[in-house]
Amino acid sequence: MDVTELEENLFAASDAKLHGDMCKELSGVLCKVLSIFPSLEGARPRSKSGIQALCSLHIALEKAKNILQHCSECSKLYLAITGDAVLLKFEKAKIALIDGLKRVEDIVPSSIGSQILEIVGELENTRFMLDPSEKEVGDQIIALLQQGKKFDNCNDNTELEIFHRAATRLSITSSRVALAERRALKKLIDRARAEEDKRKESIVAYLLHLMRKCSKLFRSEILDENDSPGSYPCSPNEDHGSVHGFGRQLSRFGSLNDKPMNSINSGQMPVPPEELRCPISLQLMCDPVIIASGQTYERVCIEKWFSDGHNTCPKTQQQLPHISLTPNNCVKGLIASWCEQNGTQIPSGPPESQDLDYWRLALSDSESTKSQSVNSIGSYKLKGVKIVPLEENGTTVVERQNTEESFVSDDDDEEDSDINVLERYQDLLAVLNEEEGLEKKCKVVEKIRLLLKDDEEARIFMGANGFVEALLRFLGSAVDDNNAAAQDSGAMALFNLAVNNNRNKELMLTSGVIRLLEKMISSAESHGSATALYLNLSCLDEAKSVIGSSQAVPFLVQLLQKEIETQCKLDALHALYNLSTYSPNIPALLSSNIIKSLQGLLASTGENLWIEKSLAVLLNLASSQEGKDEAVSSQGMISSLATVLDMGDTTEQEQAVSCLLILCNGRESCIQMVLQEGVIPSLVSISVNGTPRGREKSQKLLMLFREERQQRDQPSSNRDEPPQKEPARKSLSAPLSVHGSTPASASVQDYEPRVLSKSMSRRKSMARPFSFFWKKSYSVRE
């Protein structure tokens, strides 16, 4: 790959969200360094200073890569407000690269040294600067954050309008981009909590709150524009259009509209927007606070919730890492502004009674939200969303169409859903809990599977609200009815529910999922989905012992030997790898003839999909003495490993060398078997061209062979040296021929040449496998 192609690939991989010019400059230099780095490693410095110089350059390269990755994965808003810090990181990366390159200049040939000087000169002439537009946006957001502390005296319309403009200038102009931004902010919050950086956490939480507000505006703008025939969406660069759209949508939140005033005149009390009401008390908040999930509640209500022993978010049911409360001055200012606009008094205290049924109130809040949404559907065009009644039931669920405009389908934030997610999930759960109708339940389970596919919050919510038990009951009914299609749907829904969620995996284990899977694997039609679920569960440490002691082990091993779908076989192999990392499972794996199955995969022609993972499983098995013994005694295993040394890629070669090193260590018989395969040329090649770990392992294996040869040759050399007896044999040769008789010592003379001949024969036979190792050149393997 030339420098141009490498640069294109590296920068395409980074895809910087912000600071693109600086990323492009650094990426270009980084590609040039990476293109000559193999030559730098090939110089093989032997001195301590040379090795340290290479290590220093490698660290500098990693720092530069990390900066590019940071600019490609981090939140745009956070990158904007930390522009000065990012600029400093770029400068430090440049200095580190210059220093590292100068240190390796003296240990490389002059041809490479000239390239290094050229790169150093380019780096020294590089000047990193922030984009003026991006810096201006960052300053605006920082000013907004500083005003947040004084938000009681600030107009909510002004704050949201400034934030909306800033987000638009950062190209956050669609619901999809807003979703990606919210997810990036959530990751930053998690990182700040892990680092216990309270200041960073509060800043990012405030940005996330404003981002959620703007997400509604982005989506509503699209709906309004689509609702008007012949109208076109405003360009992201047209600030005037964006501001007008922003003001129009802000009115729909009830902040500056006239409808509440009309309601007052007609004798009706204005209804506060949902964002200003506590999800528990459903009343206008007096002292709003933010909890770890990002939701806002009345302080007294959420404190009562926590004092009752709960450690989850009442609205999302998300497990909370901590129960600390952060005042939400933004919402408090919005409440004050709304009360002023609608002629109502600002709440002077919390609700009088806190003896509340939290779940019922949250649900009723959802129902009121749903009612408002349904009443306003007439003025919207909800493209990408349609309401589909289930057969033989009045339950209504939402089916999302896969069109370009169905941006709602990827949004995992319940605040952005037109039809309340909580109500929708409860409808789905109600269908699953019905006594009859497996076919109807199967359709619901399929919808649940699709909902869970890419929605982490849905997994958290459903896992905490009885969906695990309901899906397991459905799967049990499908197994009892021998319904293969229903079994597949149920197993894959459970699979999606368990993805990246150990709590849901634990619930499945305690609820008897292994027992159901053992019933499923008795039918060949369900092998694919059962294997996939085994794979997912095997990622949990607590599940490895349970699965390892069940019928799953022989079942998964047998799949490796069958002609089945590639994905199913790969799932089985990956599951066995996870199980093999738990050493008490190794005896059960060996008793199921897993070594024979792995040897078959390694020896299969035309399929390289299994080699890397098969070798990884073999390495785990070889960690036990029983595994080593069986691998060495298995017919064809050593030959298969030797073939991988010849034909595999560098990663596979590294694993094969590691396997052979473990098997040969302390085993003379295994060493002879390996040498008979003629592996010396391959090992020498890997020691030069392999991965760093592969080079290290191959050199150790060659050294092991050399030590073994020296140990075997040493006794033979002692027997081959008769310094005093040799002249005696020559002096006795004449008398034997002259006198025609054999003296008493003749028997000794006759014996010694036989011993010498035998010793020479042994050394010759031993040296044959090493012929390539000791010669200066070689061409092909014997």
Swiss-Prot record:
Residues 707-765 are annotated as: Disordered. Residues 707-729 have a biased composition (Basic and acidic residues). Residues 739-748 have a biased composition (Polar residues). SMART domains: ARM (SM00185), Ubox (SM00504). Pathway: Protein modification; protein ubiquitination. Keywords: Repeat, Transferase, Ubl conjugation pathway. It is an enzyme of class 2 (transferase). It catalyses: S-ubiquitinyl-[E2 ubiquitin-conjugating enzyme]-L-cysteine + [acceptor protein]-L-lysine = [E2 ubiquitin-conjugating enzyme]-L-cysteine + N(6)-ubiquitinyl-[acceptor protein]-L-lysine. ARM repeats lie at residues 456-499, 502-541, 542-581, 583-623, 626-665. Its EC number is 2.3.2.27. GO terms for molecular function: ubiquitin-protein transferase activity. GO terms for biological process: protein ubiquitination. Residues 271-345 form the U-box domain. PROSITE patterns: ARM_REPEAT, U_BOX. The keyword Protease does not apply. Functions as an E3 ubiquitin ligase. This is U-box domain-containing protein 7. The gene is PUB7.
